[in-house]
Every structure is written in C-alpha cells, then in structure tokens.
C-alpha cells in the first residue's frame, strides 16, 4: 500500500468539509430586508410551521461534545482509514485529531469562526487558511455556523443564527419522514427529517447548474446515541459527486461525552513549516492520480 503524506489526507478531509459548506451563500442582506417586510397578514399554518419549531426546540443544550472517532476516506483512487477523536465547543471550535497506529497523532484539523488549520505532525508542516483571505471561501461566504450545524445535527440556513419555518417548504416523504427544502439563487438544500424523532437524517446540497455533472453533497447521519438528553449521530457519511471521481468520507463515533478539559486552540510548533494554498491544491491533485 502506498504511503501518502499525512497532510494529503488531512487536507483532503478539510477541503471536503469546506466543499460541503461552500455551497451555502450568505443571505444576511436578504434576511435583513425580509425582516423589515414582515408586517404582512398571517399566513396559513404549514407543515414547516409544525416541524421546524420542534426541531429547534430539540437541539442539544450541551456546550461541548467529544468522542473517539474512526475516520475513513474512499475515492480519488485511494482508500484510507485512521483512528482519532473529535472535540467541539459550541459557537467556538471544531477539532479533529487523526491518529496513526492507534498511538501517534499524525494530523489535526481545526475549524474556528475565523480560519481552518491543518497540521501534518509527521512531516512537520501546516496550512492555515483565514476564510476572509482565501478567494474561493470569501466568495462563497462560508459560515462556521453552517459547519457546526452539520456536525451537531441541526437545521440551518446560511447567514442566519436561527432558521425559521418561513425559510422552508415541507413535504411528507412516506409515513415517517418529511423533507424540508430551501433554495437560493445558486443552490438547493434538502433536509430529510424523521417525524418520530425530529432529527435530521440527511442533508443534500445541490448546485442549480444545468450541467449533468453539477456538484452534489450528501451528508447522512445514522446510529443515533442518547447523550445529555439529546440524540447524537454515531455515524456521519459524506458523499461528494460532480468531482473528477466520487468521494466518500465516513466518521464513526464512540464514547460520546461532554468533556470540557481540553485546549480549544491548537498551538503550532515553531519548527513546523507553513505551506501555501497552491501546495495544498497540488497535493489534492496527486490524490486523484493513478
């Protein structure tokens, strides 16, 4: 089996998560104007009016979520699997540690409200990408809150702190699920929600491009586990199509807890070499080779 630089795996994972969210264009300006125009007659209650408030009320009240993690990437000509952990502090940070041979921390990914940090501890390299200084992130208005919602299994609308029923159309899909849909100028989002638990079971983001190979991301949840009065997914599976080759990332979680005794910011060793975005993209292109 080929030995691939750990940063290549770390970078691939990081860019996957960014790609899964980059489709969410900010609606902050639009939301402001909508708020100013809400002096309208009350509308007839809809299925979304019933479902969305129950989902929001059921969101976890925990400030922290931590878990052990099994992390696998399949696609782009590679199959990779490592252990690790995930640590999250609400409204602040998401950290993922990738562990080789069950004992060595080989890579780390950190998402904050301001930047993405990816560290290759084996080769002593790192890349730090401030959202507002990377063109493709800034132009798509990537929002940390969207990424957090995906990991915490919560409903979201980009550019809003809390979504409302008015943001969605709702249609029953079978006897046990309802599909919530939201669309903006460039992208469409659907959330498959269980009527028995009011949890998100799948999020799909689709480009509105007429192209047959338009980008599409499916973010699926499974194996829900009771935790702190809430159900947290024991597995997240992400499928990305519309790339040169399909890509899948699977994360399986165990020992879900609310540990708060950890550093919420990763410190980069002064001896590590910082690499640039172009270097990262070159590594990703190599992953797609034969």
Identify what each model region corresponds to.
Residues 22-79, 279-290:
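N-terminal leader/targeting segments and the immediate start of mature chains
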Residues 68, 79-87, 92, 199-201:
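Beta-strand-dominated lipid-handling architectures at cellular/organellar boundaries
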Residues 17-20:
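C-terminal motif of bacterial Sec signal peptides marking the signal peptidase cleavage site
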Residues 1-10:
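Bacterial N-terminal signal peptides that target proteins for export
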Residues 137-171, 286-290:
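C-terminal low-complexity, charged extensions that often adopt amphipathic alpha-helices
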Residues 22-27, 163-273, 289:
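Gly/Pro-enriched, hydrophobic low-complexity segments
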Residues 75-79, 99-106, 186, 213, ...:
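Solvent-exposed loop/turn segments connecting transmembrane beta-strands
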Residues 93-149:
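An acidic-aromatic
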């Amino acid at each position: 089996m080929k030995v691939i630089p750990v940063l290549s795996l770390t970078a691939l994972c990081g860019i996957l998560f960014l790609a899964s969210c980059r489709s969410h264009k900010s609606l902050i300006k639009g939301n402001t104007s909508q708020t100013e125009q809400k002096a309208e007659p009350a509308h007839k209650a809809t299925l979304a009016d019933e479902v969305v408030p129950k989902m929001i009320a059921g969101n976890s009240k925990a400030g922290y979520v931590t878990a052990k993690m099994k992390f696998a990437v399949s696609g782009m000509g590679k199959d990779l699997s490592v252990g690790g952990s995930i640590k999250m502090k609400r409204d602040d940070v998401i950290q993922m540690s990738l562990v080789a041979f069950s004992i060595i921390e080989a890579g780390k990914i950190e998402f904050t409200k301001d930047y993405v940090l990816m560290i290759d501890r084996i080769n002593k390299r790192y890349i730090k990408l401030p959202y507002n200084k990377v063109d493709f992130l800034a132009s798509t208005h990537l929002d940390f809150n969207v990424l957090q919602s995906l990991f915490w299994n919560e409903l979201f609308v980009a550019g809003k702190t809390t979504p409302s029923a008015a943001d969605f159309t709702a249609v029953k899909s079978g006897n046990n699920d309802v599909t919530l849909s939201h669309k903006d100028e460039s992208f469409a989002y659907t959330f498959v929600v269980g009527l028995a638990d009011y949890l998100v079971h799948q999020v799909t983001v689709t480009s509105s491009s007429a192209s047959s190979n338009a980008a599409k991301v499916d973010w699926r949840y499974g194996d829900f586990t009771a935790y702190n009065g809430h159900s947290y997914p024991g597995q997240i599976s992400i499928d990305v199509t519309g790339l040169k080759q399909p890509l899948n990332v699977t994360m399986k979680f165990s020992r879900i807890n609310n540990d708060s005794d950890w550093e919420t910011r990763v410190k980069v060793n002064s001896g590590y070499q910082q690499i640039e975005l172009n270097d990262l993209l070159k590594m990703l292109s190599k992953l797609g080779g034969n």
